[in-house]
């Protein structure tokens, strides 16, 4: 069954990417998901095929299931959110469960965390903070210069890689620029860079404009997408 799904979803010879945003606050509309837009722009610059974005709440079972689905249809899954110390931060645990892997503590991360938080914590054995040091055994750790929650790059199965980032935009961007961008260029980038131009019209309805340029809209090269404002 899995092999059939892989044949169905993964395009032969193409590297495909999905973005998964985790956090109930996104689904409730409490915050605007700017991370996905920013990452999508970076993927376009790198020439990668990016076909799908998903947002999901802080539920262990649903996160695990969506990660398993993504593993069948894309080569690179970029995840933001759910890396913090609180009980609803479930991303790494869900990833491990999705591939039946154990988590181990990276002790050096705990030492680094204590250095960052020397004047901010009193309990040096804080189990909530230690949670952020737990990763699959073979995961490559992405340093977080702006926060305490590291990310990771991990390949749990053949032709499928997961990257995790904190949900805080400034932390995610710093980690992307410092580590992830170079890794993606070296391992995933293709020559499919999309060049785009914006043409603005005023004083005409969207339907009238569509009729006037119908031959262009129906073409595949270039792809034309009207946006009413």
Where are these regions (language model features)?
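N-terminal, positively charged, Ser/Thr/Ala/Gly-biased leader segments
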Residues: 1-14, 219
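Glycine-rich phosphate/diphosphate-binding loop of Rossmann-like nucleotide-binding domains
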Residues: 9-53
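Short glycine-rich anion-binding loops that position phosphate/pyrophosphate groups of nucleotides
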Residues: 24-25, 82-85, 167-170
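Short beta->alpha junction loops
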Residues: 52-62
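Proline/glycine-rich low-complexity loops and linkers
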Residues: 65, 89-188
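Short, well-structured alpha-helical segments in soluble
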Residues: 65-73
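Glycine-rich phosphate-binding loop
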Residues: 72-99
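An accessory alpha-helical subdomain
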Residues: 157-229
